[in-house]
Structures are given as C-alpha cells and as structure tokens.
A protein has these predicted regions:
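Rieske [2Fe-2S] iron-sulfur-binding domain
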Residues: 50-170
Length: 170
C-alpha cells in the first residue's frame, strides 16, 4: 500500500471513506469491523461454539486462526480455552480427561493443567509435589459466554471488551 502523497488524494480517500460509511448495511464489506479486520484477523473475538454444546468434564477441540484450542467448562460453569497441546510430548489435551476439578490431564503421561491459568498442577507419577509443577504451562485464551455462544480471543494484543465488538442490544 502506498503512502498518500498529496492533499487532493487525501481528500479523495476521505470522501470515499465517508461514502462507504453511508453504505453501511448494504454489504458486509462496508461494516467497520470488516475494514479493520484487514489489519489483523487475530485481534477479534470469535464465536466458536454454541454454549449448550460445551459441557463440564468434556473437552472440545477447535481450530481458530491457526491455533489448536481446547474448550472446557470449569467447576463454576465458566468456559475456558487453552492451547490444545501438552508441552511435554505434544499430545492433544482435548483427548484427555478431567480427573480433578478445574483441570484437564494429558492422556499420554498424565500431566495435569489448571483450566483457569494453564499452569501445570500435577504429574501423574509425582502428584502435585512434582518438580515440574510451576515450570510448565499451556497458553490460555480469554473466553466469554454471551448470547448463547462461546467467544474466544486469540489476539496478539490484550483482549478488548467483547461488548465493544457486538451490536448495542446484544
């Protein structure tokens, strides 16, 4: 994309932008978030699953913007999202189980991660006293439940409020 070099060209761009705003609603390309999406698709909240489909103790695997993600509810019923790979051997955590509240355990060697912060809480051979606890973790993603959907943010920047991306009445 080239830089605007003259004032005349700048006014022309401003006029086109103003016209585009007037056409809002006629096609999705005029919607402001779609224009901004050209700048970086990761820095948005995405609806990934119907809320009724996400259960406690039953991990769900999704892929969003190239990220493999595990979704699961914690013991309070809140949706949680973690990177879907165990840092030990790369096995998908979504194939594991929840043996203890607020955790998911890798099916390979039983490394157990907290759903809320991704921290390693126990190793099946040593339990919570393992020397690895506090040294390993999986990435977590901001997650919200709104209007019957589970929303996940995988952005590179800090998450903005989901409401700022939704229509006013949602």
């Amino acid at each position: 994309m080239r830089m605007i070099e003259t004032i005349g060209e700048q006014k022309s761009v401003e006029a086109a932008t103003k016209q585009r705003k007037l056409e809002l609603g006629r096609d999705w390309s005029g919607f402001p978030d779609y224009e901004a999406a050209k700048q970086g698709l990761r820095n948005y909240w995405y609806p990934v699953l119907w809320a009724r489909e996400l259960k406690q103790k039953k991990p769900k695997a999704i892929k969003l913007c190239g990220e493999k993600i595990l979704l699961q509810r914690d013991s309070d019923g809140n949706p949680r999202a973690l990177h879907d790979r165990c840092p030990h051997r790369g096995v998908r955590l979504s194939q594991g189980k929840q043996w203890w509240p607020n955790t998911v355990s890798c099916p390979y060697h039983g490394w157990t991660f907290d759903l809320r912060d991704g921290e390693l809480k126990a190793v099946i051979t040593d339990g919570p006293d393992s020397r690895m606890c506090g040294k390993a973790a999986v990435k977590t993603y901001p997650t919200e439940e709104r209007i019957g959907l589970i929303w996940v943010y995988v952005g590179d920047e800090p998450a903005h409020p989901l409401q700022s991306q939704l229509l006013k009445n949602w």
